[in-house]
Amino acid sequence: MFELKKGALFVDEMKNVSIRIGKVVEEEEEVWEEAGPTPKPGILELRKWDHKLLERYEPFYAPMQDFCNLCTMGPCDLSMNKRGACGIDLKTAKARLVTIACCIGASAHTAHARHLVDHLIEEFGEDFPIDLGGDVNVEAPIIRTVVGIKPKTLGDLREALNWAEKEIVKVLHSTHIGNEESLLDYESKAMHVSMADHVGMEVADIAQIVAYNFPKAEPDTPLVDTGFGIVDKSKPTIVVVGHNVMYARPVADYLEEMGRIDDFELAGLCCTAHDMTRYNAKAKIFGPISYQLRVIRAGIPDVMISDEQCIRADLLEACKKMGIPLIATSDAAARGLPDVSDWPVEKIVDALVSGKLPGVFLPIPEKVGQVAPLVAEAIFKKHGGERKYKFFESDEALMEEINKCTQCMNCVFTCPHSLRVDQGMAHAQKTGDLSKLAQLEEQCLACMKCEQACPKNIKIINVIMRANYDRLYNKTGKTRVGRGPIQDTEIRKVGQPIVFGQIPGVIAAVGCINFPDEMKSIREILEEFLKRRYIVVTSGCHAMDIGMIKDEEGKTLYEKYPGNFDAGGLVNTGSCVANSHIAGAAIKIANIFAMRPLRGNYAEIADYVLNRVGAVGFSWGPYSHKAASIATGFNRLGVPVVVGPHGTKYRRAYIGKPWKKDKWWVYDIKSRQKVFIEPAPDSLLVAVETKEEAIVQLARLCIRPNDTNQGRQIKLTHYIELHQKYYGDLPDDWAVYVRSEADLPLKMRDQLLKVLEEQYGWKIDWDKKKIVEGPVRHFDAGFNPTIVEEVYEKYAGEKAPR
C-alpha cells in the first residue's frame, strides 16, 4: 500500500500543459475484505469455470434455420455438416447468435443503468450515499463478487458500470465475422456478458432505490391495483410504458406538489409501472407488454409516456389511430418525433392537444412531469371519458366486423399459439354467441400478427377483447410493491435450511409474457410450490401477471402469502433490474451463512451455489433478449433455469447427460478424494412444454449434492409426489438421488425400498431396513463438494486429487 503525503505543484510558468483531475483519493482505501483471484475479470479469467460447466452441461442447439446470413458472403447453407464461406459450422453459428442475443440484453440493462446513474449524479451529486436500510449490510453482492468493490456512493457505481461496458464491447467484438471458432468459447463469452448484465441490473436498481427512496428490503410493502379495469374513467389518465422510471417520477412529483394526485389516474405498463408503484403507491399497474394494445385500443390513456425497452415498435401508430398524444423520452426510442426540448411547456401542450403533432420527443424529465398532466386533462375534457373502455361503438359494429371473416385461417397459421380464431368467428356468425371468441382472450398476446395476415383487415384483437369484455374488465387484482434486496437477517435465518435442504428450494419466477397457455397457469405453478413451503421470488412481468389472477375467494397470491424471504413466502423484488437481488440473495447465502469471501471471488461463490443452494430460475413466458442474458447470467452463477416452450427459440439449452458417469464428480474437501455423484442438478437451462412438466422439473432441479438426509428426504418427497400427481407414476430417475434409506420419503419408505430391490437390483437389509448396495454414493454428513481445483487447494491445503 502507498502512503499519502502532502505536496505542492507550481503551474504558473508551465506552457501548453493540460491538467485533468480525476477521482481525488482522500484516504487510504478501506480493506473491507481480502481481494480474491478475479476482480474485474476479463473474458479469459473465468473461462476455466465456464468450461467446467459446459463440460458437464453440454450445449444443445435447436436452430430455427440451418443457414447463416450474417454477412454479405452469405447466405450460407450450414446443413449436413457444411460450413459457411467464413468457415463456421452450424453449432458455432448458433452459439454466436446466442452470444449476440446476450450482448443485446446486457447492453439494454447496462445502458439503462448508465443513463440513470449519470442523471442521478447530476441531480443528487456523486457523493450521495448508498443506504439500503439497516438490515442490509452486504449491499451490492454482485458488484462485490464480480467487480471487487464495495460501493458507498452513487459515484462509486460508475466504476462498476465502466467495467461492465468494457466487457460488453469486448464480447460483442468477438461476434464479428472471422473471430471465434469454438462454440464452447462463444458460450463462455455469452456467460461472461450475461454476468456483466447482472452487474448492470444491480447498479440500476441500487441507484434508483437510494435516490428515489424506493422500499429498502421491506417485506411488507403496500398492495397496488393491477389489471385491465383498474382506472376510474371519470378521471384524466396518464399511462407510462417502458423500463426507465426517470421520466415517470416527475409526473407523480408534479401532481403531488399541485395537490392533484387524486384527480388523475397514473398507471403503467411493463417495468416502469413496477417502479412507479415503488415510488408512489397511488400509481397502478395495467400489466405487461401484452396489455399495451389492449389499453390503447380501449382508448384508456389521455396521454402516453414511453421510455425504453419492451415497447411496441408501432406505439406511435397505435396511439395516432386512437387520438392519444405520445411523449417519447428515451434516446433509445425517439420514434421519429421532433425534439421539443427547447420549447416552452405551453407550446408543447398546445401542439399535442390541438393535434398539430401526434407526439413529441422530450428527453427532459422535469418538463415531462409538467406537460403530461396538462395534456391529459385537456384531452380528457374533449371526450369526457366516453371513449374509455370501448372496443366498438355498438354491438352492431362488432357483428359487422365479425361477419367479414371468410375462415381463410391466415390468422391461425400466423398466430404464435395457433389460436382458432376462424372457429370463434364462424360460431359467432351462425349463432351470435361470442363465447368461443371470448375463450381466446386469455391466451391472446395481442401481438397483432393475425391482423397483419387478415385479407379483410378485420380488427381481430378488438373483436376478441370485446367478446371477453366483462371478464377482461374485471380481471383486476393486487400486486405487492417491489421490495428491492433481501435483508441480511432473512438470509441468516434461511441460509442453513436452504443449504441443508430443509427448505426444499427457491423458485425464482422471472421473465416475460410469452406464455404457451392462459395466464392463470403461472399462478397454478407457483402456488404448488408456495403450499409446499418453497420460497418463491419474482420480478418483472411475472410479478405483475400473478397479481391479476384471483382464486375462488377473490384473492391473489400476494394476498394469500407473506412477502418475506422465508419458507412459503412470495417475494416481489420489483422490476427487471431488481432481478439482481435474486442472484444477490444466492450470493449472500454463501457469504453470510458460509462465510465465503465475496471480493473478486466469483468462481468460488458460483461453485458454492451450484453444489449447495437449491435455487431454480423459472421463465414461463420468455421473449426478450434481456430474458436470455438474465437466464445465462444465472447459469454462470450455478443456478439452473427452466423456460417455457417458446424458450426453445433462444436456440440453445444446457442439458447434462446423466448416463455419462464420468461427467458427474466433485472434489470432497473432507475425504480428500474425487467423488462420483448423482446428477444434481442435471441441467442448467431446459425448456418444458406443459405446466405439469414445469412443476416436476422445478422440484427436481432443486436437488443438490450437499443436501442432508433430511433435506434430500424433503426434496424427494415433493419430487415424487408431484410426479405422481401430474403423471400418475414414479419418475424414471428418482433412484439416482437416493444415497441411503434416510433419503426416502417416510410414508413411502418400505414401498420404495422394495422397488429399489426388485427393479433396480439394489441390496436391502430388510431386518434393519437399510440400503447395503446400490447408490452412486453413500451419504456423508461432512461432505464438502467443489469442482474448482483452486477452491479445493484453498481449504484442503493440498493439490486436488486426480
From Swiss-Prot:
The gene is cdhA1. [4Fe-4S] cluster 2 binds at residues 68, 71, 76, 86. It catalyses: CO + 2 oxidized [2Fe-2S]-[ferredoxin] + H2O = 2 reduced [2Fe-2S]-[ferredoxin] + CO2 + 2 H(+). One of its GO terms (biological process) is acetyl-CoA metabolic process. [4Fe-4S] cluster 3 binds at residues 405, 408, 411, 454. One of its GO terms (molecular function) is iron ion binding. Residues 395-424, 435-464 form the 4Fe-4S ferredoxin-type domain. [Ni-4Fe-4S] cluster binds at residues 243, 271, 310, 512, 541, 576. Its EC number is 1.2.7.4. Its cofactor is [4Fe-4S] cluster; [Ni-4Fe-4S] cluster. SUPFAM superfamilies: alpha-helical ferredoxin, Prismane protein-like. Belongs to the Ni-containing carbon monoxide dehydrogenase family. Cluster B is an all-cysteinyl-liganded 4Fe-4S cluster; cluster C is a mixed Ni-Fe-S cluster which is the active site of CO oxidation. Cluster D is also an all-cysteinyl-liganded 4Fe-4S cluster that bridges the two subunits of the CODH dimer. Contains two additional 4Fe-4S clusters, dubbed E and F, that probably transport electrons from ferredoxin to the B cluster. The keyword Iron-sulfur applies. Binds 6 [4Fe-4S] clusters per heterotetramer. Binds 2 [Ni-4Fe-4S] clusters per heterotetramer. It comes from the Archaea. Heterotetramer of two alpha and two epsilon subunits. The ACDS complex is made up of alpha, epsilon, beta, gamma and delta subunits with a probable stoichiometry of (alpha(2)epsilon(2))(4)-beta(8)-(gamma(1)delta(1))(8). This is Acetyl-CoA decarbonylase/synthase complex subunit alpha 1.
